[in-house]
């Protein structure tokens, strides 16, 4: 069974927004409407629009916005629209399908590098389940690359050791499909936590588009010169409360892809004692299930340094971890210091670092561990 609720209304006024997104007030609706101008076109007060209210009406979805699906009525004349930039379609066979110039197409400046890609050459690839983990993973890498005391000696991002390292975020299509929906991406780029974003599969809106996760990883290394990569979905995981019915299983698929292409797969653990749901307390059942049934490639699951009772609880939960995997422990605290210095405040289910510190420590620890792999003689592709 399927169902979508679409209503027609008018834009009453333009509200705030962020790059690639415009928020609008809508007549008769109590939530803002979210507009992707790259998909819908520009909107103005008074425009008649079709609005998809399905997720917001159900109380679902990160952000709580209605989505403006189309501008209706007579459009302004302005000659023929510009031709699409490429030939690959994302959001395929939906009314919102868009054409992209992907890195695999011959017209793309990265096409040759991807065609000649010979492997990831041992770079670490950190796979995270949730979008909210990405800033701490990135900060863990940057803090470790910069060395001890970097936030107090000129500030993160100014140290040559971290400026020379390239970190690429690969956003999959397991969550939000539009990279523009994420405010964290813009904040991470502005703070020099990440150098570029590649959107793969049906996801779109990154600095580079790729058809598959594998070609996205190839582009990260061969075209963008990644010293490390982070793979995670965009905002908004799909979950059902069942063992296999959650889109975070894609984390294991990312570990498999990294291993198959010659990278070093590193898994960020999902750990929390603030989540009210029992299945996510301690080590989340998502992490346990993913490492068992989805991550078939030998991978390293990284844990943060924790007080002894909590560490013992985590290790007990991991007693049944398949033998193909290994567990490592790293310090996630420098990552959180780095985020604080840069003014980046990620949250998970409304909980910030001060509310759910182990969750973010675990993500930072994965980044710190991955940076150690870079230190073991890895060099940039560029």
Predicted regions: what they are:
Residues 2-122, 145-146, 161-168:
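Extended, charged alpha/beta regions that create polyanion-binding interfaces
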């Amino acid at each position: 069974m399927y169902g979508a609720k679409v209503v027609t209304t008018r834009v009453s006024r333009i509200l705030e927004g962020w790059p690639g997104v415009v928020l609008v007030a809508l007549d008769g609706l109590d939530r803002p409407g979210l507009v992707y101008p790259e998909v819908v076109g520009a909107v103005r007060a008074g425009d008649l629009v079709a609005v998809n209210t399905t997720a917001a009406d159900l109380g679902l979805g990160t952000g709580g916005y209605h989505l403006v699906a189309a501008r209706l009525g007579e459009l302004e004349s302005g000659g023929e629209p510009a031709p699409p930039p490429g030939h690959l379609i994302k959001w395929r066979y939906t009314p919102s399908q868009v054409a992209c110039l992907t890195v695999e197409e011959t017209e793309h400046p990265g096409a040759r590098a991807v065609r000649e890609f010979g492997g990831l050459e041992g770079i670490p690839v950190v796979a995270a389940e949730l979008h909210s983990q990405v800033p701490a993973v990135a900060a863990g890498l940057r803090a470790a690359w910069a060395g001890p005391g970097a936030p107090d000696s000129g500030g993160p991002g100014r140290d040559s050791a971290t400026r020379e390292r390239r970190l690429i975020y690969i956003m999959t299509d397991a969550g939000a499909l539009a990279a523009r929906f994420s405010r964290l991406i813009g904040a991470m780029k502005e703070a020099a936590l990440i150098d570029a974003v590649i959107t793969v599969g049906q996801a779109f809106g990154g600095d580079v588009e790729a058809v598959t996760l594998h070609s996205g990883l190839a582009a990260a290394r061969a075209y963008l010169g990644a010293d490390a990569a982070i793979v995670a979905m965009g905002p908004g995981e799909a979950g059902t409360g069942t063992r296999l019915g959650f889109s975070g299983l894609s984390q294991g698929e990312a570990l498999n892809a990294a291993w198959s292409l010659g990278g070093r797969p590193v898994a960020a653990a999902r750990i929390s004692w603030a989540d009210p749901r029992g299945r996510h307390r301690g080590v989340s059942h998502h992490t346990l299930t993913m490492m068992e049934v989805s991550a078939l490639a030998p991978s390293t699951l990284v844990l943060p340094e924790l007080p002894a009772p909590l560490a013992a609880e985590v290790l007990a939960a991991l007693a049944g971890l398949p033998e193909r995997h290994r567990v490592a422990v790293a310090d996630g605290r420098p990552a959180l210091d780095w985020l604080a210095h840069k003014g980046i405040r990620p949250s998970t289910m409304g909980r910030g670092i001060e509310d759910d510190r182990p969750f973010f420590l675990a993500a930072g620890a994965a980044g710190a561990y991955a940076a150690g792999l870079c230190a073991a003689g890895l060099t940039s592709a560029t």
